[in-house]
Amino acid sequence: MGMRMMVTVFPLVVLATTVVSLRSNRASDGRRGIVNKLNDLVPKYWTECCGRIGPHCSRCICPGVVCPKRG
């Protein structure tokens, strides 16, 4: 019975992983499109980094990166 369950569960895990991967790729493409539209309005102002969009330099909004202070 254990082997039979493993044979059933494995394809489900592979399918779920594939769906999640495809969704994240599509989301990234959507964000890129939004950034491009915003850059048409205000060039070089909007950036995407780590799944977020904002009016910051892309390195500053990534975790683990210290943003340089403006004087």
Curated annotation (Swiss-Prot):
The keyword Signal applies. Keywords: Amidation, Disulfide bond, Ion channel impairing toxin, Neurotoxin, Secreted, Signal, Toxin. It comes from the Eukaryota. The cysteine framework is IV (CC-C-C-C-C). Belongs to the conotoxin A superfamily. Residues 22-44 form a propeptide. It is found in: Secreted. This is Conotoxin Bu25. InterPro entries: Conotoxin_a-typ.
